[in-house]
């Protein structure tokens, strides 16, 4: 008999709506013992079967659902089916947009909670973020090896969230070749170097692909400030769009060095690109005090909020940094501003920008809205999957 997680009375509604998480407060009891990440059955208070998921006793998310089909086992064949389903959509996108790199698996939205897989050329970069994902590591890798024999697999599960589920951080080659120090990929006509082994996340922010392309229509003959530039994707796109100058700011000299290489790799005019190692908050104030002005500002900060207790502080941070950006823009200038914090809703983010404009003493018009690229889908039953949001704002 399988181990069962029994829900408290009335707590089955989210599962009936096919939401993939069971929170600790919804659990009445466990029937049997399960190890960390083991597959369990989830039943309502009367014993009616609801789902099959992965058990995580140390997490507030006590179980993550693998399947709502009682006949479906969680094995190599299961992972192969999920991967093939996900690949169909990526194949269409890759052909349509000429991509050699994309997100293959976007966790819950692809039916594989806690699993992220990015493909960069013939390298699959894996992040296992939950106990269930780690428990199924061998089955997942076996499925990947069968479906993608041409690909090497590299593990970037060096993510702090694993500690919340009682797991160590892991990183390194799994199968095949070690990724080169910098792997070239292509995106909308740009050549970009990706640091799989040491870069942020899996090496590159594929989710901003569409936003980087959209930037080009705003920058012709404009002076651009690229904040939190990382390896310069927005900077290269701005130069390809014909900007007169782009200033890229980041705290990491290593990232700025790669950004410079990316400009050179695309045979763009390096004299139009400036790379500044500094704290963005501090530098924006310095620019304001000096009377510096820009025509376009890209504001793409890291996540400011990890949990609900940090949300108010994050709101203040987003408001402050966008206020400073608005103050630095010429009349008619464009602010391209983003938040990758999942707890920050699009409506709240828009309100923060509006409040920032009031504090800056300027009017803004919202002219375009952004979200994560289409290889980062959001399944209807899991709205939390929509984490990246952004706006193009015209500053009056």
From Swiss-Prot:
GO terms for biological process: rRNA base methylation; rRNA methylation; single-species biofilm formation. InterPro entries: PUA (IPR002478), PUA-like_sf (IPR015947), PUA_sf (IPR036974), RLMI (IPR023542), RlmI-like_PUA (IPR041532), SAM-dep_methyl-trfase (IPR019614), SAM-dependent_MTases_sf (IPR029063). PROSITE patterns: PUA. GO terms for cellular component: cytoplasm; cytosol. Its EC number is 2.1.1.191. Its main location: cytoplasm. GO terms for molecular function: protein homodimerization activity; RNA binding; rRNA (cytosine) methyltransferase activity; rRNA (cytosine-C5-)-methyltransferase activity. It comes from the Bacteria. PANTHER family: RIBOSOMAL RNA LARGE SUBUNIT METHYLTRANSFERASE (PTHR42873), S-ADENOSYLMETHIONINE-DEPENDENT METHYLTRANSFERASE DOMAIN-CONTAINING PROTEIN (PTHR42873:SF1). Belongs to the methyltransferase superfamily. RlmI family. Specifically methylates the cytosine at position 1962 (m5C1962) of 23S rRNA. Methylation occurs before assembly of 23S rRNA into 50S subunits. This is Ribosomal RNA large subunit methyltransferase I. It comes from Escherichia coli (strain K12). The lineage of its organism: Bacteria, Pseudomonadati, Pseudomonadota, Gammaproteobacteria, Enterobacterales. The gene is rlmI.
């Amino acid at each position: 008999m399988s181990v069962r997680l029994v829900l408290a009375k009335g707590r089955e509604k989210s599962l009936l709506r096919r939401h993939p998480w069971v929170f600790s407060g919804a659990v009445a009891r466990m029937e049997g013992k399960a190890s960390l990440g083991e597959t369990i059955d989830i039943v309502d208070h009367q014993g009616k079967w609801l789902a099959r998921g992965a058990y995580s006793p140390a997490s507030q998310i006590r179980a993550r659902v693998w399947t709502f089909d009682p006949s479906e086992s969680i094995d190599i064949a299961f992972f192969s089916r999920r991967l093939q389903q996900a690949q169909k959509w990526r194949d269409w996108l890759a052909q349509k947009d000429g991509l050699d790199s994309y997100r293959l698996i976007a966790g819950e939205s692809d039916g594989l909670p806690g699993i992220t897989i990015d493909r960069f050329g013939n390298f699959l970069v894996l992040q296992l973020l939950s106990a269930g994902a780690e428990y199924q590591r061998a089955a997942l890798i076996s499925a990947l090896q069968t479906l993608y024999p041409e690909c090497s697999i590299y593990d970037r599960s060096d993510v702090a969230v694993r500690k919340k589920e009682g797991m160590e951080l892991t990183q390194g080659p799994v199968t095949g070749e070690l990724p080169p120090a910098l792997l070239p990929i292509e995106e909308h006509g740009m050549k970009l170097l990706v640091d799989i082994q040491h870069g942020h996340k899996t090496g590159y922010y594929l989710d901003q692909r569409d936003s980087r392309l959209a930037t080009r229509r705003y920058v012709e003959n404009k002076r651009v400030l690229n904040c939190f530039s990382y390896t310069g994707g927005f900077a290269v796109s701005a130069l390809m769009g014909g900007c007169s100058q782009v200033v890229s700011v980041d705290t990491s000299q290593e990232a700025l060095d790669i950004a410079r290489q990316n400009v050179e790799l695309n045979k763009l005019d390096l004299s139009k690109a400036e790379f500044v190692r500094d704290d963005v908050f501090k530098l924006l104030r310095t620019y304001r005090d000096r009377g510096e002005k820009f025509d376009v500002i890209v504001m793409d900060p890291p996540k400011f909020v990890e949990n609900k207790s940090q949300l108010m502080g994050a709101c203040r941070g987003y408001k402050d940094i966008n206020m400073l950006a608005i103050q630095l823009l010429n009349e008619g200038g464009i602010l391209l501003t983003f938040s990758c914090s999942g707890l920050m809703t699009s409506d709240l983010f828009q309100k923060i920008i509006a409040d920032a404009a009031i504090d800056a003493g300027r009017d803004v018009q919202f002219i375009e809205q952004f979200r994560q690229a289409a290889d980062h889908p959001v399944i209807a039953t899991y709205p939390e999957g929509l984490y990246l949001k952004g706006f193009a704002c015209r500053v009056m």
